[in-house]
Design a protein with these regions (language model features):
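Small-polar-interrupted transmembrane alpha-helices in polytopic inner-membrane proteins
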Residues: 82, 86, 107-123, 142-143
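Hydrophobic cores of alpha-helical transmembrane segments in multi-pass inner/ER membrane proteins
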Residues: 6-14, 45-46, 81-87, 146, ...
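Membrane-interface helix/loop boundary segments of multi-pass membrane proteins
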Residues: 91-113, 154-158
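Functionally important transmembrane alpha-helices
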Residues: 137-193
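Aromatic-anchored segments of alpha-helical transmembrane domains
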Residues: 46-54, 115-125, 167-179
Length: 236
């Protein structure tokens, strides 16, 4: 919580110094349109992420059961951990900095820079340094997702949309299923984990298809939205 407050304060100071603006550039005023569109993006991401786990159950014989330690505290902590982490990353990578980059460099360059920063941030957080293949895979997915999230903000000038996409994926991966860093999950994996040999097609359907589907479906959903910024149309 303290980190969020500090980041918001720094964002306000930055926009105030650069163009005497305020945090309204983040597009956080709630409207029915933003709620409906955000809900659609959230559900698309959550459904795509869930599909990956369902294929693991079907093809890899993995089993997940309700966490025996579940209680109200675990649920609250698990949800809040994901809300705060996603919000922090959105403010850092798609907040005032992205808004100013759009005005300075145009949308295409701003989106590209934001995506690179997002990918590098996940390199630091995922502990993959020293493993070239893992570094490549993490960078490829997070860079592609970073492009989508930055594009969502650049097109709509609202953090609701990148937040909804990002949170929809993370809440399934990190809270519903036990693949996140926080440890407070609704489901846990039954042990021992089965050792199953699958084809390359099945492997790709488990680990690659859900990610690609989330990026592609959300991209087209965002693309259908009315652009909020008429200047620097090169990234529309």
């Amino acid at each position: 919580m303290f980190q969020l407050v500090v980041l918001l304060a720094c964002s306000w100071i930055l926009i105030r110094i650069v163009e005497k603006g305020d945090l309204s550039v983040l597009g956080l005023r709630p409207t029915s349109k933003r709620f409906v569109h955000g809900a659609v993006l959230f559900l698309l991401s959550a459904a795509c992420c869930s599909a990956g786990y369902l294929t693991r159950v079907f093809f890899a014989a993995e089993r997940f059961v309700l966490n025996p330690a579940i209680d109200a505290g675990l649920v609250f902590t698990g949800i809040w951990s994901n809300v705060s982490s996603v919000l922090f990353e959105e403010l850092l990578c798609r907040g005032v900095g992205l808004y100013l980059l759009i005005k300075l460099l145009g949308r295409s360059w701003a989106v590209l820079i934001s995506a690179v920063v997002f990918a590098l941030l996940h390199w630091l957080n995922s502990g993959v340094f020293g493993d070239p293949l893992q570094m490549l895979l993490v960078f490829a997915f997070t860079f592609a997702m970073g492009l989508l999230l930055a594009y969502a903000y650049a097109r709509t000038l609202s953090l609701y949309y990148p937040f909804a996409i990002h949170f929809g994926w993370n809440i399934v991966q990190n809270f519903t299923f036990p693949d996140g860093p926080f440890g407070n999950t609704l489901l846990v994996q039954m042990l021992p984990v089965p050792e199953v040999t699958v084809s390359y097609a099945v492997f790709l359907s488990i680990f690659l298809f859900p990610k690609l589907a989330a990026i592609v479906l959300n991209f087209f959903a965002v693309r259908r939205m009315t652009p909020a910024l008429k200047a620097a149309p090169d990234a529309s």
